[in-house]
């Protein structure tokens, strides 16, 4: 513990020195604190120090708690999850004013919720950084709760997580008892949790509110450190393409293409997804400040990636957080459709997790990777993949399909896998 503490003290000093030298505000629970603790353009040393702080603080907590307190502390996880669902359902994030505070009694009336239970829930949530009690018997926003109020996409993430992800995770035992070793997309923990026989995306398509919330969740993931598209923009030499066409395969409403288009004005994009998804793309673009420029360079096309690829002359086919949703055989089918259309010099860019072996990366990072792996199993009967899993897929698609390079940008949970066809 002493060694971890010394490292923690040293890294906190490194991070504080960075904040002082750059003028970036110090981390705080105060509502006016920036939601991003360390911007992507901060120095590599600062990012490394922050990563070590997260890891060492986590390990110190685990060591200080010890085995006998493991289950005691485990309770907090599912209760935090329950609180988020309660707070979303009763619209507490939006009923608490951004400035100042509101009395519990008044908030309970607005929320149509019982005051004693309201107090219990929010005081539990406070121990995890949501809300502040100031003054006594009054509720005010913290930096984190204000984010969930102000940012509709992050609120959609919270709703999707609490209403769908939580019950799905708890149905994993029943799914594996009922369908051991299944790779079918409609034999999952999700199917048990929601009582549907449809695969996830087919079931989602029947529910307009859930579909909208899921799109918001995907946009918020694209802006979250570790999974944000800025890492994609920085992790590959997009500028070297010059004037080029990029197909955003399964690109939803186009949030990834938007981020790349803003940084690389020579690139044009075709966002492909199912008809009901891309139909919402132009509306998403129209709300952006730079909509006019983006509309001239980002187009939408209804397309299933299991069908022959209609765009034959693209320079890059990009699949960001797509293949992890699908089984081995489906991944082979998806990539085979792209290989059939690759012109000489064209690339396939896969942006997905490449799982490390246990203990290779920090525990604070590894647990986020393992979470994603479990989610893929629970929702799709798929998986996050180790490098050897990826290589097996590529060899099955075409022996000529070459991995040119694999890059994991600093601070990212995901890697960029560049593929091309051998001459």
Curated annotation (Swiss-Prot):
Name the Enzyme Commission number(s) assigned to this protein: 2.1.1.-
Where are the catalytic residues? 324 (proton acceptor)
What triggers expression?
Answer: Expression is positively regulated by the cluster-specific transcription factor aoiH.
| SUPFAM superfamilies for the chain | S-adenosyl-L-methionine-dependent methyltransferases, Winged helix' DNA-binding domain
Q: Which residues form a coiled coil?
A: none
Under which pathway is this protein filed? Answer: Secondary metabolite biosynthesis
GO terms of biological process kind: methylation; polyketide biosynthetic process
A GO molecular-function term, please? O-methyltransferase activity
> Which Gene3D superfamilies does this chain map to?
Vaccinia Virus protein VP39, Winged helix-like DNA-binding domain superfamily/Winged helix DNA-binding domain
Q: Which Pfam families match?
A: Methyltransf_2
Q: Which InterPro entries match?
A: COMT-like (IPR016461), O_MeTrfase_dom (IPR001077), SAM-dependent_MTases_sf (IPR029063), WH-like_DNA-bd_sf (IPR036388), WH_DNA-bd_sf (IPR036390)
Binding of S-adenosyl-L-methionine, residues: 273
Top-level division of the source organism's lineage: Eukaryota
Top-level class of the enzyme under EC nomenclature: transferase
Could you tell me the keywords of this UniProt record? Methyltransferase, S-adenosyl-L-methionine, Transferase
Functional summary from the UniProt entry: O-methyltransferase; part of the gene cluster that mediates the biosynthesis of a methylated derivative of known natural products orthosporin and diaporthin. Within the pathway, aoiF catalyzes the biotransformation of orthosporin to diaporthin but also of diaporthin to the final product, by performing a tandem methylation of the polyketide core.
Q: Which family does it belong to?
A: Belongs to the class I-like SAM-binding methyltransferase superfamily. Cation-independent O-methyltransferase family.
Q: What is this protein called?
A: O-methyltransferase aoiF
Please tell me the species this chain comes from: Aspergillus oryzae (strain ATCC 42149 / RIB 40)
Point out the gene that encodes the protein.
aoiF
């Amino acid at each position: 513990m002493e060694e971890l503490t010394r490292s923690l003290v040293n890294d906190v000093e490194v991070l504080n020195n960075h904040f002082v030298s750059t003028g970036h505000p110090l981390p705080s629970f105060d509502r006016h604190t920036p939601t991003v603790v360390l911007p992507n353009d901060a120095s590599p040393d600062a990012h490394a120090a922050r990563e070590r702080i997260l890891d060492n603080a986590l390990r110190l907590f685990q060591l200080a708690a010890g085995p006998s307190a493991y289950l005691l502390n485990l309770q907090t996880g599912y209760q935090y999850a329950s609180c988020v669902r309660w707070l979303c359902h009763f619209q507490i994030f939006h009923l608490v004013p951004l400035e100042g505070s509101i009395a519990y009694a008044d908030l309970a009336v607005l929320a149509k919720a019982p005051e004693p239970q309201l107090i219990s829930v929010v005081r539990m949530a406070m121990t995890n950084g949501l809300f502040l009690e100031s003054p006594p018997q009054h509720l005010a926003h913290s930096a984190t709760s204000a984010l969930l109020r102000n940012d509709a996409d992050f609120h959609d993430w919270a709703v999707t997580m609490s209403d769908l992800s939580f019950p799905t995770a708890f149905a994993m035992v029943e799914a594996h008892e009922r369908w051991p070793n299944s790779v079918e997309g409609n034999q999952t923990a999700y199917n048990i949790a929601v009582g549907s026989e449809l695969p996830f995306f087919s079931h989602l398509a029947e529910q307009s509110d859930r579909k909208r919330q899921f799109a918001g969740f995907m946009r918020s993931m694209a802006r979250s450190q570790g999974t944000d598209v800025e890492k994609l923009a920085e992790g590959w030499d997009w500028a070297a393409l010059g004037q080029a066409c990029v197909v955003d395969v399964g690109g939803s409403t186009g949030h990834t293409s938007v981020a790349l288009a803003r940084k690389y004005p020579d690139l044009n994009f075709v966002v492909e997804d199912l008809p009901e998804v891309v139909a919402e793309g132009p509306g998403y673009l129209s709300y952006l400040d730079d909509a006019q420029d983006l509309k001239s360079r980002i187009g939408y096309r209804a397309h299933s990636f299991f069908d022959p690829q209609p765009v034959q002359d693209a320079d890059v086919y990009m699949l960001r957080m797509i293949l992890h949703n699908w089984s081995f055989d489906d991944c082979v089918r998806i990539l085979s459709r792209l290989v059939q259309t690759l012109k000489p010099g064209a690339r396939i860019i896969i942006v997905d997790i490449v799982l490390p072996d246990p203990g290779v990366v920090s525990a604070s990072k590894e647990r986020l990777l393992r979470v994603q792996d479990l989610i893929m199993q629970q929702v799709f009967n798929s998986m996050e993949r180790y490098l050897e899993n990826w290589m097996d897929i590529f060899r099955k698609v075409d022996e000529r399909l070459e991995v040119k390079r694999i890059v994991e940008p600093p601070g990212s949970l995901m890697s960029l896998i560049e593929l091309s066809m051998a001459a």
